[in-house]
């Protein structure tokens, strides 16, 4: 048996926090949670992870990001979505035909995810099969768990970033065969978005998904120009979502990123099918796409998660992903005539952790029977306050101000994958740089 000691803060339900000062998580030898303890046992005959005085938080689940766009983080932010794709995204993704380049970028990406406390992902690769396998290798090596998709696109990709329909299907099957060697990273079918895939390709992916029982991820109603484009390509579809539905790709556990402009009818289709929304507020604001009606989605019973959506999103930080969702909801409040309530810190923390972890079969918060996914945060170097803060206040402060320097330990799938507990805390303001590779 093992014991993780510290100040525990987790989100067992939307809007609810459980805070346990000087608490402990009792784990079995495989890192499975046996019990959440409100008092630390005095005599414990087993391995102890002593994080006394540190926050023990759930790790983050990033439910939508583009791995090959990592080199582009922070660039092209003055362009709308479709122009940005042509000018920045497609050219950099084409470079991942070079496996040496792919290895360097993906190794850095995987390490940075763990360093920021993100342990579960649903991720887009590029259309390159071998580079996608490299990405899966690097994620698994770093300790990340989750789903990765080889992108499918047989039209509108531009120079050097487009497959034939036959090639896309053939390479998808080759990739799926190779995926059997991975333990913690699994495949997810990934038609880039409707404008990038012909009907023949979409139909083939729907058939593969049904035959092999595979999940699907894509994009939905991110940008008004994109929606109009889909309408031109599929005049038989009254709404964007139907362009997936008619090929068997609109189903339980399908992840749809964005849904910024999903109206009541489209939201109803999302809920009824069990489709999962990956809300990406940083990306949506950066590309001026809009702000998703998250409060309405939650009120209507939709399953909402969060995504960093790099490189339209500007940070891999799970904590920034959470706080950006709060900021976006506040902007929505004063621009929407209906004045929907903004997200609270407990609600946003839930969306960035528990709600995403549920996609992988986890329970609510630190639930007994789940493999541990946690991050220990050293907040001792934050500015001294005139009074002692409660654990919920410390969580709020950490979410808004923490950096990777404050992350002192990370557990993924019950494994300790990052351990800096013996190092002195690094000031958040310290300048840091690291060479790629």
Features from the language model and the residues they span:
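N-terminal metal-binding scaffold of metallo-dependent hydrolase/deaminase domains
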Residues: 1-43, 54
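Divalent metal-coordination and catalytic microenvironments
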Residues: 7, 25, 31, 53, ...
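C-terminal cap of metal-dependent C-N hydrolases
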Residues: 13, 371-431, 436
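Active-site gating loops and adjacent loop-to-helix segments of metal-dependent hydrolytic enzymes
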Residues: 73-104, 150, 155-165, 223-251, ...
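Alpha-helical scaffold segments that flank or form the walls of functional sites
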Residues: 73-144, 168-181, 436-437
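Metal-coordinating catalytic core of metallo-dependent amide/deamination hydrolases
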Residues: 130-259
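His/Asp/Glu-enriched, well-ordered alpha-helical/loop segment
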Residues: 246-253, 295-383
